[in-house]
């Protein structure tokens, strides 16, 4: 991976609820120019949003905040092993746990219908008073 163009981002995942020294393990093989998309594991039921936040904080301390992003799983496992869309209140609990962090949603278009996006967006505006800066229209685009 060292020969790949920079920057490069790698998606990482752990099947353990709170893996020990996960941050150090990731650092041991991750090229210096790479960042990580840490998949939270909440959608598959491996961990809670709070557990995912602790792992994210460890990754940020070890790799740097500029090289670490959390990927919010917008789905849940059903009893038959298939997946369903996460309910808006489930997504909101994840967003609350990751407050102040850069969040990407997987798989937004597949698991987040229009009504779910509207509900989460309305909640965000009511709680934070605005749309996230990363979603706002750039100032120079007018």
Region annotations inferred by a language model:
Residues 1-142:
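Glycan-processing catalytic domains of CAZymes
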């Amino acid at each position: 991976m060292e020969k790949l163009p920079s920057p490069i981002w790698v998606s990482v995942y752990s099947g353990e609820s709170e893996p020990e020294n996960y941050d150090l393990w990731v650092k041991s093989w991750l090229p210096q120019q790479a960042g990580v998309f840490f998949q939270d594991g909440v959608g598959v039921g491996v961990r809670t949003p709070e557990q995912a936040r602790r792992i994210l904080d460890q990754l940020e301390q070890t790799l740097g905040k500029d090289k670490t992003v959390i990927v919010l799983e917008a789905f849940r496992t059903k009893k038959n092993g298939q997946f369903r869309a996460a309910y808006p209140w489930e997504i909101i609990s994840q967003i609350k746990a990751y407050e102040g962090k850069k969040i990407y949603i997987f798989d937004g278009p597949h698991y987040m219908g229009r009504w779910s996006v509207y509900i989460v967006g309305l909640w965000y505006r009511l709680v934070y008073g605005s749309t996230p800066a990363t979603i706002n229209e750039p100032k120079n685009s007018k």
